[in-house]
């Protein structure tokens, strides 16, 4: 049988993920980790979520934020 182990994660391309970690977002948007973390801390609820000590960037909302910003 071709069963997939339960503990093995299905890897999605970054462009298909709804929420990205700071590290993934830094790679996807070509923005530094520190800058993204600062943006996430200052924009909780707008395009960022906090899960414990981890920030998640909501990709579609962050894309919209970037398209409306002249500088970050």
Q: Which residues are covered by each model-predicted region?
A:
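Polyanion-binding surface elements
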Residues: 7-35
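A short, Lys/Arg-enriched interface patch at domain edges and termini
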Residues: 4-5, 62-72
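Short, structured secondary-structure boundary patches
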Residues: 22, 40, 55-59, 70-71
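Major-groove DNA-recognition helix of helix-turn-helix-type DNA-binding domains
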Residues: 27-56, 63-64
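Hydrophobic alpha-helical segments with strong N-terminal bias
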Residues: 5-8, 43
């Amino acid at each position: 049988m071709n069963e997939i182990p339960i503990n093995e994660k299905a890897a999605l391309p970054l462009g298909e993920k709804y929420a990205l970690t700071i590290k993934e977002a830094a790679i996807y948007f070509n923005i530094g980790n520190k800058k993204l973390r600062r943006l996430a801390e200052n924009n909780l609820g707008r395009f960022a979520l906090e899960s414990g000590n981890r920030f998640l960037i909501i990709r579609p909302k962050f894309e919209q934020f970037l398209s409306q910003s002249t500088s970050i």
